[in-house]
């Protein structure tokens, strides 16, 4: 499988031959940052279009069809329209926190997005405590949401923000336990190493029952973490209008909207990385010809295919199940998912100690 570190090393050598090393490193950081933001924007556009089409399919509709072939240009038109909208600042609001909140949410999303290993040698932030960094970066978004609700001077926004904060903080525990289950299996917290350990089989299939249970818990908790249906109580239209979004307009609302969709992709990308092998191709023992053919498919194609499969799965869940009440959401987490996650972690420890995994 192709290693993108060959390209990055060549670019680094080329830049250092033309300029001082410090300036070359600075230029590399700028290039990587621009590429990260471009990929972030492209993923957001693809996710929004996919959401509208999947929603339409489940509701026996066609979705966007007018602008461009099969409605592919509709999202770009919506972005242009949003860019022209006036950003209205609410009277008696805390203007500093009100304007700062969307950018905190975006910052948390971008930092978490940078942790995803897209292909071998194509990781932006890859170090030995990558799991810790991902959990820490993703938790910053809760601060932005609470600030948005508090600074809007609106009781519905505040209630929506408090619901969202309680929900996100609670379900981070189950996400952490699910990821920790795989960390115990691999003995590493570096995402690239977790992927490399799956060269002979994805953990969803070779980690036995604890890995499967962790995957199911992760999908449920991840859906709740990004406030997607049936866990989208912070935006319950019949109760709170738009929740903490209520008083936001223009690009401020757009930043919240984009962050929600990219966070969904991040949850799916992490699931693809730790459970489905990341950039590793599908290999079947004994099928040498098939395995060789699969190796020719680039790693980033495998990663995005797996990630978007999980995205589709989560969208299917959203448009299938009815919205839960806040007490049902917290009961599901504290009475069921957390205890099951703890017992499952203990089972994985037993599996690893007695070498019961493949």
Model-identified regions with their sequence ranges:
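Selective transmembrane helix interface/packing segments
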Residues: 1-358
């Amino acid at each position: 499988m192709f290693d993108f570190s060959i390209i990055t090393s060549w670019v680094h050598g080329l830049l250092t031959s033309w300029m001082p090393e410090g300036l070359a490193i600075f230029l590399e950081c700028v290039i990587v940052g621009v590429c990260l933001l471009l990929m972030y924007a492209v993923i957001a556009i693809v996710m929004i279009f996919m959401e509208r089409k999947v929603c339409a399919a489940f509701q026996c509709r066609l979705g966007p069809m007018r602008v461009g072939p099969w409605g592919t240009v509709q999202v770009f038109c919506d972005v242009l329209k949003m860019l022209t909208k006036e950003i209205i600042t609410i009277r008696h609001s805390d203007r500093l926190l009100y304007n700062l909140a969307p950018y905190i949410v975006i910052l948390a999303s971008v930092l978490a997005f940078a942790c995803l290993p897209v292909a071998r040698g194509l990781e932006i932030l890859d170090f030995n405590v990558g799991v810790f960094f991902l959990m820490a970066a993703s938790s910053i978004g809760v601060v932005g949401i609470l600030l948005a609700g508090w600074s809007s001077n609106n009781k519905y926004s505040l209630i929506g923000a408090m619901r969202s904060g309680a929900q996100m903080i609670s379900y981070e525990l189950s996400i952490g336990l699910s990821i920790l289950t795989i960390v115990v299996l691999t003995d590493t917290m570096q995402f690239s190493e977790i992927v490399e350990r799956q060269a002979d089989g994805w953990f969803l299939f070779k980690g036995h029952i604890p890995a499967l249970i962790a995957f199911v818990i992760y999908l449920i908790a991840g859906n709740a973490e990004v406030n997607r249906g049936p866990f989208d109580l912070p935006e319950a239209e019949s109760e709170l209008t738009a929740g903490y979004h209520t008083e936001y307009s223009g690009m401020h609302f757009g930043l919240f909207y984009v962050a929600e969709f990219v966070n969904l992709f991040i949850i799916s990308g992490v699931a693809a990385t730790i459970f489905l092998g990341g950039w590793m191709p599908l290999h079947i023992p004994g099928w040498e010809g098939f395995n060789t053919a699969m190796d020719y498919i680039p790693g980033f194609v495998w990663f995005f295919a797996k990630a978007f499969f999980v995205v589709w799965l989560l969208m299917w869940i959203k448009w299938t199940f009815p919205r839960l009440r806040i007490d049902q959401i917290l009961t599901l987490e504290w009475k069921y998912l957390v205890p099951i996650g703890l017992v499952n972690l203990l089972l994985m420890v037993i599996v690893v100690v007695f070498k019961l995994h493949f």
